[in-house]
């Protein structure tokens, strides 16, 4: 049970004052792809500005001044973004990273400066969850402090987080994923174009069942995809958002962080995400309660989470490997 005082402190307004400082409305899509077709795997190119809180996390190599996209992230405000802890298994120094905001297309291994409306920023601090486990992917969540602060505008804006009282995301519902990851499981490079795809939230009991993930799913996870596979996040999408629409506010809420999976787009092996709702207290403790935008979401029914037990730790997920460090030369 979360303290009442924390709940009151974290009842954060989403009313705009100055959008350039990222204090404006959160979760607002500036543009949408109206084609509705369906490559993420099984997705489509996203329109520029469709997901303005999307951030490209790029490894910076000093010997040739080149940048390589390796993970995604979600902008929370002008100074902080949310991503996955496993993105930092090898590269943990702030000087190893560059952040690109407002992008639709990212170029692999470029040494060219970005041009407006894109913005490039450095990293001041990386905060990895204290109980993150690389073997089980428990607590796969991290924060990055941006320097200098990013300026929000037409293609850049903050994402929303769920409020405490929202509870876990409601199942069933159709949500969205986005990223620059692989377009097929055996690809060798990430997609240059931002991809988006609709995915269904999957009951954790089903996701944790014998023929699915067989006890590997934790109560702090969200599963999303389809029983037959075919549409999924993949390598390079890690750290990016799983987003559900709040119909009352007409905003999108980041309910999950792309974490792990067995292969990509396989049947009965949907994407596994870190539930942001489970870590709201942790996020607020690191960046301050007034620094996050929150939106109420429909509460999950009690029947939607049976079988979502914390893993014993003896069963380890076949986590998508840190492929990107082998590809960068």
Swiss-Prot record:
Single GO MF annotation: D-mannose binding
Any one annotated GO CC term: acrosomal vesicle
Entry superkingdom: Eukaryota
GO biological process: acrosome reaction; activation of adenylate cyclase activity; proteolysis; single fertilization
All residue ranges annotated as the Peptidase S1 domain in the record: 40-288
Complex and partners: Heavy chain (catalytic) and a light chain linked by two disulfide bonds. Forms a heterodimer with SERPINA5.
Protein name from the UniProt record: Acrosin
Gene: ACR
